[in-house]
Amino acid sequence: INDNNSSEKKEQQGKRNLEKAAMIAAAADVPVTMVSRYDLNIASGIIHTIKEYEATDIVIGLHRKANIVDSFFGHLAESLLKGTHREVMIAKFLMPVNTLRRINIAVPPKAEYESGFSKWVEHFCRMGSILGCRVHFFANERTLMRVQQLVKKRHAGTPTEFSILEEWEDLLLLTGQVNYDHLLVVISARRGSISYDPSFERLPAQLGKYFSNNSLIILYPDQFGEPVSYTHLRAHETRHDLV
């Protein structure tokens, strides 16, 4: 709750939102601890709560009618992503999660070098297995190979597909691949990270324009821990090619 303009009405609304989230989590048999916090602004409140509770994953939900650009991107996103290195997901669902038929994941070049790479792959493979829906990865050839290796090693039971996305600018070509009952996941990156690309700055506007009628998740990988090195991956790829 923003301490600068808090009121009894806003406090009650915040409590109702927490209770609604707790009910949804309870239906999925997920334990929830409800926390109300007063702070100077939303980003500061989230960042301090992450530290106090040692949160490892941050999920921010947007209202189904909200514009993803106006609701999150801007000062809030910049402050939050600078304030924590933990994995951040911005989610907007237009339909119940258990009715999704497919998860489409757009992966940028060099995403395999981020320290949170295996973590988010596991998230969505597990999600696909639980929901009984196919997980379809789109990436350039090198990155797609690393995704395939990881899925084969750790999540072989998950129904998956893999398609080449030669250029990140071709993201708009996915409009023909994503239906209303699909979830589109876009793996982004923090400014200055190894997989960051300046084209990410246009991403919110593109998603708002071309995928406004789709359920969306934008994920910023975990930067916590040791990043995967080029040397390590190149050595792995060399061994793989020789087998």
Residue ranges of each PLM-predicted region?
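Local beta-strand N-terminus motif with an aromatic residue
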Residues: 55-56, 180-183
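A short, acidic, amphipathic alpha-helical segment used as a generic capping/interface helix at domain edges
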Residues: 146, 166-179, 195-208
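Structured cytosolic domains appended to multi-pass membrane proteins
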Residues: 1-146, 153-155, 161-175
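Short, conserved loop/helix-junction motifs that constitute active-site signature segments
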Residues: 128-131, 208-212
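Glycine-rich, Arg-bearing micro-motifs that act as flexible, cationic patches
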Residues: 62-79, 187-206, 221-229
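C-terminal functional regions that serve as terminal interaction/effector modules
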Residues: 183, 210-217
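Conserved small/polar residues in nucleotide/adenosyl-binding loops
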Residues: 231-240
